[in-house]
Amino acid sequence: LLLEAYYDTGNLLIDPYVGKPVSIIDKELLMPIFREDEPVVRLLPFSSMGEKNGLVEALTVEELYIKEGKKERQILQAVIALGSPSLFQKKEYQMILNCHLL
């Protein structure tokens, strides 16, 4: 799955179960990949300006590649939260990268 992403310095979400930074993807883009097998998701607590005590579904993917220009980085066992499609409406990106992945 190839998509545009945005580094968000305000995305400080860390998975409390595995201690890894969490990036957010448009849920509708990711779910078709899991047609036959339901992904194993867990609920992560989060707080934001709009939601003080929220929960978001997240999963761990084997690898995530981040490409900037000619440089490419591989993140193993990356944690991805499943964001609401409305979060990405009228945006030029489909994923919000955690600032700790810079």
Q: Predicted segment positions?
A:
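Pepsin/retropepsin-fold aspartyl endopeptidases
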Residues: 1-102
